[in-house]
């Protein structure tokens, strides 16, 4: 099943109503950029916000959501803007959205009921799609930062708090999309979870949720209003105090769960070991840089785990460099039998052939990627960032099959992080990072 060719009943009918373009996190867009033969132009807006993601509701109706990088000083808050997709001018803005003073990126989506939903910190908000006023506000049961917000086929919302190893079990919460009342009992997993959730809707209507834990990947079944752990699918990808770090989000593609570990890098640990999460008495400065050495010696790994047989688990180290680390998950492109992996701490982008059920490095590119990418299977283009030695964060376009660098575009940003790239549907890409939001268009 492919997100870009099947609409999901939980969302407003749009090509990109939610992060990664769909619940399976395949990050694949219809159309093509043809960046190699085009000329790129950039519009950038610089401000004091932590821009996380852009989503589309109606055609041309775009929203950007995020938080504030308020690691010290005045308290943080979440926010959503409706923007002009060409100029990036703000057409409407939400009020400051309470977040329990937790500093983390959160998420937004365009729901089938017409509302814009926003999760940030320990709060969930339902917003009017036109003026972004608050329609409903809900404090979530877990007083921690939350990441990942998905709509399920029945319209209900699901989210989770973020917990590292040794911080107890992560809480998954399911809510009514109108009232934001909690449905059933929140589910506390046997272990913490750092990465965002994914979900898979089968042709027969069965829907399951996938959660990357601190040691296992978990599949959650929906039984009425209740969330139930699937006892038959709990593959282990690491052990306690392992020489590899925790997994970020999973990508569900070709009946396989794709994941990269080594994600709870030093800065992530520091943010989530404070209460409220990400709040410090004095400015933390470079203590929150993702370029710091990894707190383990294991190299970056890519995992391939069958959705039908959890024992069919293949692992590869695409780079082999000690102390690997990332802040965003991989992507799999079934049309090319290729998974894309990277090592943000040490540098390096790799295409990994997934043909015949195996994993084999097909190509390497000497760049330093960190973001959630976008792929265009029709044209074979991968869009991701490269944080350069000069301290600029460029957007690059790469040939999925060969790893050839097709184009490089300066965004005007000097901060890279693990936020989301989004296809605009008109040979364009929206770029979100701390202090910068940009649109790159090819003609």
Regions found by a protein language model. Give the residues of each.
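Beta-strand-rich domains and repeat architectures in extracellular enzymes and scaffolds
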Residues: 2-78, 99-106
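Short glycine/acidic-enriched loop and turn motifs that connect beta-strands
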Residues: 23-24, 68-74, 123-125, 163-167, ...
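Blade-level signature of beta-propeller repeat domains, shared across WD40, Kelch, NHL, RCC1
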Residues: 410-443
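A short beta-strand motif characteristic of beta-propeller blades
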Residues: 39-46, 89-98, 133-139, 181-191, ...
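Short, conserved, GDST-rich strand-edge loop motifs in beta-rich repeat architectures
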Residues: 64-77, 161-168, 261-297, 387-388
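Repeated scaffold domains used in trafficking and secretory/extracellular systems
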Residues: 48-56, 99-109, 142-153, 191-202, ...
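Loop/turn-rich, solvent-exposed surfaces of beta-rich toroidal or solenoidal domains
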Residues: 325-350, 360-400
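Blade-loop segments of beta-propeller domains
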Residues: 47-54, 67-69, 76-113, 121, ...
């Amino acid at each position: 099943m492919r997100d870009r060719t099947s609409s999901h009943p939980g969302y407003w009918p749009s090509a990109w109503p939610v992060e990664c373009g769909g619940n399976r996190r395949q990050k694949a867009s219809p159309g093509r950029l043809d960046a190699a033969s085009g000329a790129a132009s950039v519009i950038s807006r610089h401000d004091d916000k932590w821009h996380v993601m852009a989503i589309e509701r109606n055609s041309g109706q775009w929203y950007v959501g995020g938080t504030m990088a308020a690691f010290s000083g005045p308290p943080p808050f979440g926010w959503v803007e409706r923007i002009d997709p060409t100029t990036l001018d703000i057409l409407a803005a939400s009020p400051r959205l309470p977040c329990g003073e937790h500093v983390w990126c959160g998420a937004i989506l365009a729901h089938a009921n017409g509302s814009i939903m926003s999760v940030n910190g320990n709060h969930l908000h339902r917003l009017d799609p036109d003026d972004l006023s608050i329609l409903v506000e809900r404090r979530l049961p877990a007083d921690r930062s939350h990441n990942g917000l998905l709509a399920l086929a029945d319209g209900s919302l699901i989210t989770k708090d973020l917990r590292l190893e040794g911080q107890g079990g992560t809480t998954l919460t399911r809510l009514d999309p109108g009232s934001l009342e909690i449905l059933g009992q929140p589910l506390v997993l046997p272990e913490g979870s750092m990465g965002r959730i994914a979900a898979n809707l089968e042709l027969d209507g069965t829907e399951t949720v996938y959660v990357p834990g601190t040691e296992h990947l978990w599949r959650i079944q929906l039984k009425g209003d209740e969330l139930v752990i699937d006892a038959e699918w709990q593959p282990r990808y690491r052990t306690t105090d392992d020489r590899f770090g925790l997994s970020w989000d999973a990508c569900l593609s070709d009946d396989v769960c794709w994941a990269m570990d080594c994600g709870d890098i030093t800065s992530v640990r520091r943010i989530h070991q404070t209460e409220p999460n990400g709040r410090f008495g004095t400015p933390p400065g470079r203590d929150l840089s993702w370029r710091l050495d990894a707190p383990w010696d294991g190299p970056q790994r890519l995992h391939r785990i069958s959705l039908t047989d959890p024992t069919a688990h293949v692992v590869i180290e695409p780079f082999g460099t000690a102390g690997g680390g990332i802040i965003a998950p991989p992507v799999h492109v079934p049309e090319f039998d290729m998974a894309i992996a990277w090592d943000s701490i040490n540098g390096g982008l790799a295409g990994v052939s997934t043909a015949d059920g195996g994993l084999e490095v097909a190509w390497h590119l000497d760049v330093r990627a960190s973001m959630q990418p976008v792929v265009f299977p029709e044209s074979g283009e991968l869009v991701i960032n490269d944080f350069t030695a000069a301290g600029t964060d460029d957007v690059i376009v790469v040939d999925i099959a060969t790893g050839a660098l097709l184009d490089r575009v300066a965004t005007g940003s000097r901060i890279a992080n693990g936020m989301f790239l989004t296809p605009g549907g008109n040979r364009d890409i929206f770029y979100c990072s701390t202090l910068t939001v940009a649109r790159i268009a090819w003609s």
